[in-house]
């Protein structure tokens, strides 16, 4: 698994932005601190609450969510689910799970990515990583606390 101190891998994938435009999303699109989070599938019941929670981080960092579902699925889900209709960050299609495979966060039995969160600095170096089981949601407030501590620096 790619971890703390390593560079986050470059990606060029399709996604849906906060205005529901579909297009190419790359690592270069994100400046400064970044929170990249991965979730198993669109149209599930845990994921919308996590996505809505992660949206509160957009004032602190660039935020982007990833799953293996395609961009058309993401757009349909955004339009269908009130919790994520108005999010202010992109959802990206890691079709084929190439990025998830490179990060080594794929559950081989289920064929989906784990619930992983990466906090990445302005130099694209991973400063924090956490990976949860498929059925265990994340706490966006804890991600925010970790992000703020990392941005503050020092011990």
Regions inferred by a protein language model and the residue ranges of each:
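Chalcogenol-based redox active-site neighborhoods
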Residues: 1-155
